[in-house]
Regions:
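Polyanionic/metal-chelating signatures
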Residues: 97-133
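Charged catalytic cores and adjacent phosphate/nucleic-acid-binding surfaces used
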Residues: 1-39, 44-46, 58-76, 80-100, ...
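Short, acidic loop-to-helix structural element flanking the phosphoryl-transfer center
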Residues: 181-195
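Short, flexible active-site loops
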Residues: 111, 140, 171-178, 204-205
């Protein structure tokens, strides 16, 4: 089964219609509620977006329903924490609904369930270690707010209680106490399961180069030799034009799709959803049932994105310990 066979075909988008295919909510380490996020998208005239929480699709169905009501097409997605070649990789998987009950989707949904169970266990272990060290966490239930308690909530509670200043210090505290926040699935297994379910697999933020590490051309070729990933997130909030050009070239030279995402976690954290032009990722959108009119002029070239980072701005992000500092270890 492939995504084209199961996607709902939408009216054709214009080349400059706004899309953002990498957004987070409070289902993982974000602070947008589905209602707040979809309302923002509608108010700012986005046509298509994708909710890609870390290892969770708990917000997807609500966001899809709200999107239908407000005129924003929400593509089901998830950012799966995977491992390959001795390190973690964030994999954006598009096109798989969390309410699937068919055999084709069973393995992929099982991977997410396994990650959820491991994250809950890691969170409870971290809580016990922190409290045993004399640092109580009485507001943990308040911080989790009825959601499954994941490591991110434990870290956030440690900050709220004044035990540490930021997420990086919180993660270091748990590591020093012998705990772990790592939960990931084998990349090859995840891609295979996603493809069985009709999903499309895109390597997230290959040029970011902070806690999750940048992707080199050699990395990509070694990966493609054994794992059939489908694309690269070649447009990203922190990329300069030179980085976007590099990852578009790496994708096109290898027949890969291109995705566009802000990685917004909350209002202005690190950024609001970005209005990427639909034609910049038209191939991916078409595979997901969203056709795009291709302009007669250049699809993308340097200078087209007014929000592209300047070279001096393209540095390691989140120096003060915002969620991206510890994404690789906390999901």
């Amino acid at each position: 089964m492939i995504a084209e066979q199961t996607a709902t075909v939408l009216p054709r988008l214009q080349p400059d219609d706004a899309v953002d295919l990498h957004l987070h909510t409070l289902a993982s380490d974000g602070f947008w509620t589905p209602a707040e996020l979809v309302s923002f998208l509608a108010d700012h005239h986005f046509r298509v977006a994708s909710i890609c929480d870390h290892d969770s699709q708990r917000s997807v169905l609500e966001a899809m329903q709200l999107g239908d009501e407000l005129g924003v097409h929400i593509i089901p997605g998830v950012e799966v924490t995977t491992n390959w070649s001795g390190r973690q990789w964030h994999l954006l998987v598009y096109g798989i609904r969390p309410d699937r009950s068919d055999d084709d989707a069973a393995e992929f949904l099982a991977i997410l369930a396994e990650l959820d169970a491991e994250l809950r266990a890691n969170a409870e272990d971290a809580r016990q270690r922190i409290e045993a060290s004399g640092k109580p966490l009485p507001s943990l239930s308040e911080v989790a707010a009825g959601r499954p308690v994941w490591p991110f909530h434990v870290l956030s509670t440690a900050i709220k209680e004044g035990h540490v200043k930021n997420l990086t210090e919180a993660a270091n505290l748990v590591t020093q106490l012998g705990g772990s926040f790592t939960a990931d699935a084998p990349l090859e297994r995840t891609v295979h399961a996603a493809h069985m379910a009709g999903g499309i697999c895109v390597i997230a933020h290959p040029g970011r180069g902070d806690s999750v590490g940048a992707v080199t051309e050699a990395d990509l070729d070694r990966m493609l030799a054994s794992i059939p990933i489908d694309g690269l997130e070649a447009h990203y909030r922190s990329y300069t034009d030179a980085q976007t050009a590099l990852y578009r070239r790496l994708a096109f030279d290898r027949g890969l799709l291109v995705s566009c995402g802000s990685d917004s976690h909350a209002p202005n954290q690190p950024v609001n959803p970005r209005p990427f032009q639909a034609n910049w990722c038209a191939g991916l959108l078409a595979r997901l049932g969203v056709p795009v009119t291709i302009p007669n002029s250049a699809v993308w070239e340097p200078g087209m994105d007014p929000l592209a980072a300047k070279p001096e701005e393209s540095k390691q992000e989140s120096p003060n310990g915002s969620p991206d500092v510890v994404e690789a270890t906390t999901s």
